[in-house]
Amino acid sequence: MIDRYCRPEMAAVWADERRLALWLEVELAATRARESRGEVPAGTVERIRSCTRIDLPRMLAIEAEVHHDVIAFLSMVAETAGDDARHLHTGMTSSDLVDTALACQIQEAGRVLVAEIHRLRHACWTLAQKHKHTAMVGRSHGVHAEPITFGLKVLIWSEELGRGLDRLQTALMGCAVGKYSGAMGTLAHLDAAIEDDALEALGLEPEPIANQVVQRDRHAALLCAIAVDRKSTR
């Protein structure tokens, strides 16, 4: 992202370091669910968490050798987590990790957007109240028309922002899904209850019917909602 066009709080969501931190959380969520069922030795998750340090330069160096970002990430974690790292990624495919972490990032970014729209809508409401008796020339067909108030004009903006907020929140809900169902989405290697518990810990729902990835119509709907909302703020 280009820093001068991005708010610091949004840049932080999409920083590589944050992405990798979420990758670790996604891995640990599944491992914790397995640990609670006795499939992994007790204390494994906390030992991994306490030992692991996100080292982006080291991961990139490994990736340059193995040409695979997830393998590079897991190798980086294993360098500090040691033998416990063997319990990570069991039964998962790369997209289980990447798409689920992306869903977490989208929800974080969505909270920033929603807060800003609320702030902008409140500013419009305040401005509308201030100018509810401020007369101005209305426009129709590109020419002067009957008089209105500036407050009315601003209220139209506020209402449009409200509809945009509804669209955005609906689209964000549609993206609040992840998966641990494996390469073909068949849960061949992890129990569905483990997927449910891991995703619940991350604040997500399971993709009801999946293949290798979370289906992209979810992301397309979000981008469309953002594009329409962008029109409202121009």
Residue ranges and their predicted role:
Residues D196-V214:
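A short, charged helix-loop
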Residues K231-T233:
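Conserved small/polar residues in nucleotide/adenosyl-binding loops
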Residues I48-S50, Q212-D217:
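Short linear loop/turn motifs
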Residues I106, A225-V228:
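Short, Φ-rich (hydrophobic/aromatic) sequence segments
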Residues M1-L187, D191-D197, P206:
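A helix-coil-helix interface module used to build multimeric assemblies
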Residues S94, H219-I226:
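Hydrophobic alpha-helical transmembrane segments of multi-pass membrane proteins
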